[in-house]
C-alpha cells in the first residue's frame, strides 16, 4: 500500500493536446533518426500503433511507435470470453435495444458488495450506429469495487472517454500511467491496452465510446485564441514498464461489441520508450475556462464544449462532450436556467457532483438522463417557479459546487432493453413538468415591455 501511495505521489505527465510526444523510461531507449532500426536499443522490439489510416491527411494522422520488451503479437489465439458479457453493445438494432422518444432519467446505480472489476461492471445504456461500419457511438456506465487482476482491456471498436463519478481510477496503459479523480476525465484511444485499479475501492462513472473518429478540441471562432479547454492542460503519461514473466496474463479484447480473451506470459505494459501523437490522456475539468452571456439571454450549451468528435458535415458532431461547471450568472431581464428546448441533437446528461441548475431534485450525482432528438425538455416546475418569483431580485449569482456534463450527438440513440427495464429508471420523471401552469394574461404585460413597444424605432430617451 505504501509503495502504491508513493507511486501516486510521484506520477509525472507531459503537457499538451495532439502533440508529438517522446518519452523514455530508460535513457537512450528511443532509436535515433529512424523508427524501425535493424536492432533497437536494449534489444527492444519496434511496434507501431495506428489510430488513423496511413493515408489520412497529415494534420489528422495519428500514430505512435512503441519500443517494448516483447511485441503484442506474442499471445495465444483469442477465444470468446466465458461467461459472455451480455450488456455490451456496439451494433444497435432491435435485438438489443429500442427507440423511445420519452424523456428518460435514471437514479444512480448501486455499487455491488460482491467483487466486480471495471470490465464486468461496464454496461451499455444507449447508442447508435455500428462499430463494424466505423460510424456511431455508445454510452456506457460502470460500477466496480476491485481492480483488474492479471488482465488488461483493449477496445478494438473505438475510443473511450471515461468520466469517473465516485472513486479514483489508476489506469496503466502502454504509454504509462494515469491517475484520474472524479472531476477529471481520461481518453483511451482505440486499440490501446489498459488496466484499471481502484485506489478508493468502490467506483462508479460514465463512459462515452465513439467509432471511426477521434476527439479533438472545438474551434473557438469569435471567442479568439484562448478559452474553454486549453491544450496545455491535457496531460499524457510518461513511459513506464513492467518486465519479467506474468504467467496466465489475460488480454480482454472488445471486438464488435463482444469480448474475447487471449493468454500470454508477460505484461502488455512492457513499453520502455515511445514517441508519437496517438496517446491516452487526461484532463481536469476544473481548469476549463467557461464563457457566458454578460448582459442578456442564456447562452447555448455549445459554449461549454470540452471535446468534440466531428462528422463529415461542418458543425455537426458525432459526439460532443460538454460540461456545466461553476460560473457566474449575471444576465439581466433573463430567465437564467437553461431554456425549454427541442433539439435536433440527442442529449445524454450525467452529474459528477453537486446539483444541476435546471432540476431542483431527482437528478442525482451518478444518475443520468436522456432527451432524444426533438423530445421536449427543460427546467422542472420548482426551478421555473422559483426563478420567476425572483423577477425583482436578480442580482448576480454564482453557481458553485457543481459539475454536470452532457454527451450530445447528431445520431438518434437506441436504448438498451436492460436500461429501460432497470430498477433505477425513474418512471415518474415526467411529473417534474406536470405542474407547469399557464401564466398567460392579456393585461399583465411587464411595464418595461409596454414602454419599449410604445417607443418609435431608434428613438432615444
Curated annotation (Swiss-Prot):
Pathway: Amino-acid degradation; L-phenylalanine degradation; acetoacetate and fumarate from L-phenylalanine: step 4/6. GO terms for cellular component: plastid. Fe cation binds at residues 341, 347, 377. It catalyses: homogentisate + O2 = 4-maleylacetoacetate + H(+). Signal peptide: none annotated. InterPro entries: HgmA_C, HgmA_N, Homogentis_dOase, RmlC-like_jellyroll, RmlC_Cupin_sf. GO terms for molecular function: homogentisate 1,2-dioxygenase activity; metal ion binding. The keyword Nuclease does not apply. One of its GO terms (biological process) is homogentisate catabolic process. Its EC number is 1.13.11.5. It holds the Pfam family HgmA_N. It comes from the Eukaryota. Keywords: Dioxygenase, Iron, Metal-binding, Oxidoreductase, Phenylalanine catabolism, Tyrosine catabolism. Its cofactor is Fe cation. Belongs to the homogentisate dioxygenase family. PANTHER family: HOMOGENTISATE 1,2-DIOXYGENASE. This is Homogentisate 1,2-dioxygenase.
